Amino acid sequence: MVTINIDGQKLEAKEEQTILEVARENGIYIPTLCHHENLAPYGACRLCSVEISKGGRSRIVASCLYPVEEGLEVKTNSPRVVSNRRMIMELLLARCSQNEVIKRLASEMGVEQPPFRPEYWEDEDCILCGLCVRTCEEIVGRSAISLVNRGVNREVAPPFFEPSADCIGCGACAYICPTGAIKMDDKDGTREVYARNWKKEFKLKKCKVCGNYWAPEEQLEYIRKKLNLPADFFDVCPNCK
């Protein structure tokens, strides 16, 4: 165990923990957009930046990536931190000026208008946090989408912007997306997972008991093979089992 100081509070932490983990365990709020406790730390959004001091020197670090160490002093809302977060929110608001999640978070940090508004980001919702890509790979065990291109053309997409054979229609990407950039609709026995520049449709499995459509056939077949389940295991939905 090590002892650190966050905003004047002396706290004990395990050596392998990050500053963000310790802060959350102790009810100290640090904003994030790209972090999830079930995924490996990524440090994309930088909203979780804090100011650390040790040995008379201070610097700004991403709290989701920085491991705690004995005697570390952390400030989560110093003038440097607040200024840094405001700049990040200005850039995010410039990219996603009409997204309600970003507008609300920006407003909380005192940012009401973006400093500029490029036309190539018109109606953009994706903040490039990478949550969808990492969830697909780390949790689902697939690689249906990835971050492609560079600079202002950076975006999330399947290979060649074509429906990916790796996509099973589970919808985990849509569920984890913090801004609604990826969407999922179920209608008339079909599921559609889509974003701004790509989409894929899936046939839903129909329960043999209640007759309701309840999950994509590709997803169920993937699970069945992975767990070596009987061929008829998913003929009945969970509600009717």
Predicted regions, residues:
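Short, structural beta-strand-to-alpha-helix junction motif
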Residues: 17-21, 67
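Short, contiguous acidic and Ser/Thr-rich linear segments
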Residues: 10-17
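A basic, amphipathic helix-loop patch mediating RNA/tRNA/ribosome contacts
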Residues: 20, 26-50
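Extreme N-terminal starter segment of soluble prokaryotic enzymes
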Residues: 1-3
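Loop-centered beta-sheet repeat module
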Residues: 161-175, 179
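Fe-S ferredoxin-like electron-transfer domains
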Residues: 57-166, 185-217, 224-240
